[in-house]
Regions:
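Glycine-rich P-loop/Walker A and Walker A-like loops and their local beta1-loop-alpha1 context
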Residues: 1-30
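Short linear motifs at secondary-structure transitions and domain/linker junctions
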Residues: 21, 52-54, 89-93
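Short, solvent-exposed loop/turn segments at secondary-structure junctions
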Residues: 10, 49-50, 83, 122
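Conserved nucleotide-sensing/catalytic segment adjacent to the nucleotide-binding pocket
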Residues: 25-77
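Fold-independent oxyanion-binding glycine-rich loops
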Residues: 7, 47, 119
Length: 126
């Protein structure tokens, strides 16, 4: 699995598609589709969006994602970096940001490579 992370609107998707020769048909958008609809697409967009539904169900996102990581061994995951902006106002928003941070850390630990994209430029972290 390869992980690409970065801030909002920094070109993560375009970077992934160009550098890993992926097309629109290779994309699964976790912000728009339930995870159960994943059908082998190699590029998983908005992986951080998987966290909130699990939290709302009282589940632990870092546990829930484990079976999926085995299925995604050949996938490229894109996730948004959190924690570099304003502190969220509500306790629920702070809990979500913290959970996404732990989730991204787990993804990075499990990934073969980790790249950070800023201004459309990739930097290899792992």
């Amino acid at each position: 699995m390869k992980l690409i992370l970065g801030g909002y609107a920094n070109g993560r998707t375009a970077y992934a598609m160009q550098n890993y020769q992926l097309t629109e048909s290779d994309c699964f958008d976790a912000a728009a589709e339930p995870l159960a609809r994943w059908n082998g697409q190699r590029l998983i967009l908005h992986a951080e969006q998987l966290v909130n539904p699990w939290l709302e169900q009282g589940k632990e996102p870092c546990t829930e994602i484990l079976p999926w990581l085995e299925r995604w061994q050949n996938a490229v995951l894109i996730t948004q970096e959190v924690g570099c902006g304003l502190v969220p106002v509500t306790p629920q928003q702070r809990q979500l940001r913290e959970a996404v941070g732990h989730f991204n850390k787990l993804l990075a630990e499990c990934a073969e490579t980790v790249e950070r994209v800023c201004c459309g430029l990739g930097m290899q972290l792992k």
